[in-house]
Amino acid sequence: MKFKTFGNRNDPAVLFFHAMGVTGESSEPVANYLQDRYFCILPTSTVYCKGQKYVSKADEIRQVEAYLKSQGVERLELVVASSIGADLAMAFLTSTKLSIGHVFFDGGQFAQIGKGTRRMMTPFLYLAIKSLYWSKGGTLKKILWCDDDSIKPYFIA
């Protein structure tokens, strides 16, 4: 796992969990805005870290906890999580001993989807991801309803 921070370590802490397909850097615009008042912590999952191997959700949480402890964080004023990052954040929230002020989930995937529906959706998701790759981001607007060039680097390597 890789961690990037913004702000003063002595200020109230804000922890971000990124969405699938992006890194912790996707939260930098918000962290830049907050850094004068908050200590912003942007972890990047091991899945996106060169030379690291994803082990488990529990291991990701262990790494976040260890980092927070190493930075002297005893309380989180805010936890922000997007999309699949909300799943990791929920696991973090249910296991951490840290005090949490507020939580904000953006597009968390908490629906219980049956096996049959998942099997039907998988080929479509696969094609959507492949089309992003093949078109070098050209289909981004069709998939995410946006085509802002400033966000393409977070989706297209």
What positions do the PLM features span?
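Active-site signature of alpha/beta-hydrolase-fold catalytic machinery across serine-
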Residues: 29, 91-95
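Conserved alpha/beta-hydrolase catalytic His-Asp/Glu region
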Residues: 114-117, 131-157
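Conserved HGGG/HGGXW glycine-rich cap/lid loop of the alpha/beta-hydrolase fold
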Residues: 4-50
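Flexible "cap/lid" loop of the alpha/beta hydrolase fold
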Residues: 94-131
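Active-site loop/oxyanion-hole signature of alpha/beta-hydrolase fold enzymes
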Residues: 41-78
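Structural motif
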Residues: 12-13, 78, 102
